[in-house]
Amino acid sequence: MTLKEAYSYAVTFLERNGVDESDFKALCVVCSILNIKNSEYDLHRNDFVPNKKLADMLWKLKDGQPLQYVLGKWDFCESEFYIGEGVLIPRPETEELVEKAIDYIKTLEKCTVYDLCAGSGCIGLSIAKKCKNAFVYL
């Protein structure tokens, strides 16, 4: 089925099964299968989407698995992080806090940051990427 057909099918499937934010989750799933950004959907509407992969991901969402675990990745502070079961899911609130920390750290001559045993490492890696004056331990 095409990306456009897969998206339509996914929205209907998720809505019928009571999954919240079915439009957004369907878009994320179908674009993830083709390894494209959500914003590139229109450019790939007629590309082929494997049915089995789509079905597997939709059933996981239906069963209540978080979208981030189903996708296996999530964006945080302009970078993509791999997310699996047992790893804390990066939240928008955390991203906002990290951006404030980055702004503060940039005002310092040097700084040491520890991001230990927190999951994906998205906090420490985001700080390391944007703050050359920080020594970050993961």
Which sequence ranges carry the predicted segments?
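A general structural signal for well-ordered alpha-helical segments in protein cores
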Residues: 7, 26-27, 54, 64-67, ...
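A short N-terminal interaction module
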Residues: 1-50, 54
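Ubiquitous "structural anchor" signal
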Residues: 18, 72, 80, 127-134
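Conserved AdoMet
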Residues: 31-103
